């Protein structure tokens, strides 16, 4: 099969297997030469392990000094004779291959992270591969929906997340990657049902359920930590993000971290929400109004030499903040701030200046659109110089592989 990029709006409909491997390899190469993680965790569970921060965390902990064994949970689309499947499928496959070559355990579990069945599979895997205990649980789920538990069965049977403002409509620009155009959009405010749905899918509810399940199964090691990822951003992004449905869910996540921290104190451990920097991920390109900010931010931070991708963020999180130090640096709300370089005052002044001038005719010049789009393409295995995209790919090498 000849695999070409297929983009509809901001969604990639194809993925290149060997390009995805290249993305994994580049992240492995980065962490091997970076400041190493000291006194890191040895047995790690990653819920949402196939892309973005979850995948980067898995790579950093395996290859960046901690030499961790990992169990990764994700929900990805497998390839067929006619379809390439999703990038996350190949990320999982190639991560496992390279981790095992390095002598590490890498277990991939495919399925619905919200389900009771997956909790049972994970506990069984912890018993089998980790002698019954984990040292770190990473919660990195970006999902559009969550099946309601049996106890709350109602119509409809799913909670659905909606990226919308709360209270009043918000206007902003979205970049359509399929034809490189700037589209002005207005988002109507969320209904109460949409606010509740987003809170249930993207908030701390399921994270807490997972930790409770693992405590009850006696699967937490002494000193066990758990983290989940959040974003806050500057004022310019607040109407659509922090003040909207996503922000409501993230604040719930922060509150959950405090409740879980009390529970993990019994294990001499801790729970933390990690506020990351704004990045191009499969999830972030969906957020209307965020793309122009990302373009300006990328341009300014690259000019200053402070730009980080997911892998740089995760390596710095584990080596500089979470492990190897007597105290974990927290802000006044007990959050770990990995957006510290993004929120640098001078950086934000320069970003705001660019944003005020940015429009449909100049966004490619004022912002780092080339870098933004290249990063998006590389999430799906495209635009790597090392890959010959004219070569046909034999999909039989990947169908039914685990």
Curated annotation (Swiss-Prot):
<feature type="active site" description="Proton donor">
    <location>
        <position position="241"/>
    </location>
</feature>
<feature type="binding site">
    <location>
        <begin position="75"/>
        <end position="76"/>
    </location>
    <ligand>
        <name>NAD(+)</name>
    </ligand>
</feature>
<keyword id="KW-0444">Lipid biosynthesis</keyword>
<dbReference type="InterPro" id="IPR036291">
    <property type="entry name" value="NAD(P)-bd_dom_sf"/>
</dbReference>
<comment type="pathway">
    <text>Lipid metabolism; fatty acid biosynthesis.</text>
</comment>
<comment type="similarity">
    <text>Belongs to the TER reductase family.</text>
</comment>
<dbReference type="InterPro" id="IPR024910">
    <property type="entry name" value="Enoyl-CoA_Rdtase_cat_dom"/>
</dbReference>
<dbReference type="GO" id="GO:0051287">
    <property type="term" value="F:NAD binding"/>
</dbReference>
<comment type="subunit">
    <text>Monomer.</text>
</comment>
<dbReference type="GO" id="GO:0004318">
    <property type="term" value="F:enoyl-[acyl-carrier-protein] reductase (NADH) activity"/>
</dbReference>
<feature type="binding site">
    <location>
        <begin position="112"/>
        <end position="113"/>
    </location>
    <ligand>
        <name>NAD(+)</name>
    </ligand>
</feature>
<keyword id="KW-0443">Lipid metabolism</keyword>
<dbReference type="Pfam" id="PF07055">
    <property type="entry name" value="Eno-Rase_FAD_bd"/>
</dbReference>
<feature type="binding site">
    <location>
        <begin position="141"/>
        <end position="142"/>
    </location>
    <ligand>
        <name>NAD(+)</name>
    </ligand>
</feature>
<feature type="site" description="Plays an important role in discriminating NADH against NADPH">
    <location>
        <position position="76"/>
    </location>
</feature>
<feature type="binding site">
    <location>
        <position position="250"/>
    </location>
    <ligand>
        <name>NAD(+)</name>
    </ligand>
</feature>
<keyword id="KW-0275">Fatty acid biosynthesis</keyword>
<dbReference type="GO" id="GO:0006633">
    <property type="term" value="P:fatty acid biosynthetic process"/>
</dbReference>
<keyword id="KW-0276">Fatty acid metabolism</keyword>
<feature type="binding site">
    <location>
        <begin position="279"/>
        <end position="281"/>
    </location>
    <ligand>
        <name>NAD(+)</name>
    </ligand>
</feature>
<dbReference type="Pfam" id="PF12241">
    <property type="entry name" value="Enoyl_reductase"/>
</dbReference>
<protein>
    <recommendedName>
        <fullName>Enoyl-[acyl-carrier-protein] reductase [NADH] 2</fullName>
        <ecNumber>1.3.1.9</ecNumber>
    </recommendedName>
</protein>
<dbReference type="GO" id="GO:0050343">
    <property type="term" value="F:trans-2-enoyl-CoA reductase (NADH) activity"/>
</dbReference>
<keyword id="KW-0560">Oxidoreductase</keyword>
<dbReference type="Pfam" id="PF12242">
    <property type="entry name" value="Eno-Rase_NADH_b"/>
</dbReference>
<dbReference type="InterPro" id="IPR050048">
    <property type="entry name" value="FabV-like_NADH_b"/>
</dbReference>
<comment type="function">
    <text>Involved in the final reduction of the elongation cycle of fatty acid synthesis (FAS II). Catalyzes the reduction of a carbon-carbon double bond in an enoyl moiety that is covalently linked to an acyl carrier protein (ACP).</text>
</comment>
<dbReference type="InterPro" id="IPR010758">
    <property type="entry name" value="Trans-2-enoyl-CoA_reductase"/>
</dbReference>
<dbReference type="InterPro" id="IPR024906">
    <property type="entry name" value="Eno_Rdtase_FAD-bd_dom"/>
</dbReference>
<feature type="binding site">
    <location>
        <position position="231"/>
    </location>
    <ligand>
        <name>substrate</name>
    </ligand>
</feature>
<feature type="binding site">
    <location>
        <begin position="48"/>
        <end position="53"/>
    </location>
    <ligand>
        <name>NAD(+)</name>
    </ligand>
</feature>
<keyword id="KW-0520">NAD</keyword>
């Amino acid at each position: 099969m000849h695999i070409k990029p297929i983009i509809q709006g901001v969604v990639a409909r194809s993925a290149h297997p060997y390009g995805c491997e290249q993305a994994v390899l580049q992240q492995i190469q980065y962490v091997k030469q970076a400041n190493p993680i000291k006194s890191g965790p040895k047995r790690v569970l990653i819920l949402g392990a196939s892309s973005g921060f979850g995948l980067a965390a898995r790579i950093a902990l395996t290859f960046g000094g901690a030499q961790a064994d990992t169990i990764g949970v994700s929900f990805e689309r497998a390839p067929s004779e006619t379809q390439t499947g999703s990038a996350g499928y190949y990320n999982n496959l190639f991560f496992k291959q390279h981790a095992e070559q390095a002598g590490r355990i890498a277990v991939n579990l495919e399925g619905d992270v919200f389900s009771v069945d997956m909790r049972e599979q994970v506990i069984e895997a912890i018993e089998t591969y980790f002698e019954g205990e984990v040292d770190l649980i990473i919660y990195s789920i970006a999902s559009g929906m969550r099946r309601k538990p049996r106890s709350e069965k109602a119509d409809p049977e799913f909670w659905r997340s909606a990226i919308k403002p709360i209270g009043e409509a918000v206007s902003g620009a979205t970049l359509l990657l399929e034809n490189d155009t700037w589209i002005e959009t207005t988002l109507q405010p969320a209904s109460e049902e949409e606010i509740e749905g987003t809170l249930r899918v993207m908030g701390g509810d399921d994270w807490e359920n997972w930790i409770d399940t693992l405590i009850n199964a006696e699967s937490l090691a002494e000193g066990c930590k758990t983290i989940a990822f959040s974003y806050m951003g500057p004022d310019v992004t607040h109407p659509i993000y922090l003040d909207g449905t996503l922000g409501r869910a993230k604040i719930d996540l922060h509150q959950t971290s405090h409740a879980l921290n009390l529970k993990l104190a019994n294990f001499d451990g801790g729970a933390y929400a990690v506020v990351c920097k704004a990045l191009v991920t499969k999830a972030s390109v969906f957020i209307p109004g965020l793309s122009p900010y990302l373009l300006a931010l990328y341009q300014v931070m690259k000019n200053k030499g402070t730009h980080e991708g997911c892998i740089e963020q995760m390596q710095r999180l584990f080596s500089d903040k979470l492990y190897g130090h007597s105290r974990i640096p927290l802000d006044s709300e007990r959050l770990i701030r990995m957006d510290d370089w993004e929120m640098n005052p001078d950086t934000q002044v320069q970003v705001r200046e660019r944003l005020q001038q940015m429009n449909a005719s100049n966004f490619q010049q004022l912002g780092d659109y080339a870098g933004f789009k290249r990063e998006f393409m590389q999430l799906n295995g495209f635009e790597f110089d090392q890959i010959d995209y004219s070569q046909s790919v034999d999909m039989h090498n990947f169908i039914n592989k685990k």
